[in-house]
Each structure stands twice: as C-alpha cells, then as structure tokens.
Amino acid sequence: MRFDVVTLFPAIFDGYLTQSLLDKAIVRGLVEIQRHNLRDWAEDTPHRKVDDRPFGGGPGMLLQVEPTVTCVRDVDAMADVPARKILLTPQGRRLDQRLAEDLATSDRIMLMCGRYEGFDQRVLDILQPEEISIGDFVLNGGEVAAMTIIDAVVRLLPGVLGDEQSSLDDSFSRGNRMLEFPQYTRPREFEGHTVPDVLLSGDHAAIAAWRAEQSRARTIDRRRDLLPEHSKNNPEQTNKLS
C-alpha cells in the first residue's frame, strides 16, 4: 500500500515514520509513505504562499484552490494506481474500525491535511475527495488525523503485526465488534489483585467463553450502542455501522 500525504508541514511526520511497527513495515516494503509539501506548488514562488483571506470576511486564512488542485493532480499522477483521495476535516464521516478496514483494502491513499480555516470550498467541489473526521473536536491541522488513519490502516495490512489474530480480537474489529475483554500478564498477584483462575487453567474453550462473556459485559457497561441487538432496534445506528 502507498500513502501520499499532502501537507504544509511534512517534518511533523519525521519521528512518527521512524518508530515501532510502522518503521518496520516501511523497511520491509509492506507500506510506502510519501510526503508532499503543498508550498512546492505555490504560484507566489518567492514566499511560497498558498493561503489567503476568505471572501466575505472572517478570521483566519484559507488554503487556496489553485495550488491545492494542481498539487493533488500532480501527486496522483506520480504512481500508476489512482489514489483514494481523503480530506481530513471535522465535518467528515467519523473514522471507525469498519472504515479503517475498508481503507485497508485500498492500494493507494492520498491524505490531504488542512491548516488554518481549511480549504477553499472549490477544492472539494473539483476534486471530490472523501471527507473523514477522527472525532468531534478541532485540531490545529490535519497531520495528526492523517497519522491516526495511517496507524489504524497499516496495522491491518498482512504481515505488519506479528500475529494476525491480534487485530481480529481488538475492540470494534471484524472478529469482535464489541469492546475487547480484559487481559493480564505476570505477576499472578499484585497488591491483592489476582489473575482470574480460568486464564491459568489451560482450558481453551473455557478461556474463549470467559473472554466472550467479559467482552459483552464490558460493552453493555460502556458502549451499549455497539451491541448487535441495539443496532437492530436503531436503524440509524445500523446505517452508521454498515
């Protein structure tokens, strides 16, 4: 899979791309991540200016349509496979595990990171990108949201995780749409808190049953909206999860 990230601040990604599983995935050729500085497409060459004040007044600056559209088209042409274009915005579809799984089936994704007051509306009208949000809050720019999408998607690619079962058991995942069960490691006891006996029994069927029960109980307590029967009784929620 290839990611192309369009951003005003490509250096923000320096540390992120050289750590942990993502770095290993890049080294092993499982994923390619290219960063593109939008300022390289600035028409105002001396100052590399790609923003201007909004028509009608108001605070802040908008990213201009000309350099953005040209940049996205040029970047799209850098590889044979057309990119799935995604614009990061708090107004977009909420990122969830199902969407991450869908994105993981793509061969190439372009992430458009906004700044300031966002993009000129004509960027959306002309390029028709998917709009994705990581939550009902506002960030200084789309870079952190882009990292979130990359992280959520890359871990789903074959070969990235040491054990493919790991992603299936995660909360919200295709192997378990509910919240994940509690997990324990050594020591068996700490300050009076002990590991449940069933996890030490070696009885795999009993362990699986305990985990399923705990997963459901935790979901009922914390996220009842994730329960299948809740979705059936709430068509609007079902549509969101489909």
UniProtKB/Swiss-Prot annotation:
One Gene Ontology cellular component: cytosol
Record's compositionally biased regions (Basic and acidic residues): 223-233
Subcellular location: Cytoplasm
Reaction(s) this enzyme catalyzes, per UniProt: guanosine(37) in tRNA + S-adenosyl-L-methionine = N(1)-methylguanosine(37) in tRNA + S-adenosyl-L-homocysteine + H(+)
Positions of S-adenosyl-L-methionine binding: G114, I134, G135, D136, F137, V138, L139
Major subcellular location class: cytoplasm
Pfam families registered for this protein in UniProt: tRNA_m1G_MT
Endpoints of the signal sequence: none
InterPro entries: Alpha/beta_knot_MTases (IPR029028), tRNA_m1G_MeTrfase_C_sf (IPR023148), tRNA_m1G_MeTrfase_TrmD (IPR002649), tRNA_m1G_MTases_N (IPR029026), tRNA_MeTrfase_TRMD/TRM10 (IPR016009)
GO biological process: tRNA N1-guanine methylation
SUPFAM superfamilies registered for this protein in UniProt: alpha/beta knot
Recorded family membership: Belongs to the RNA methyltransferase TrmD family.
Record's subunit section: Homodimer.
Stated name of the protein: tRNA (guanine-N(1)-)-methyltransferase
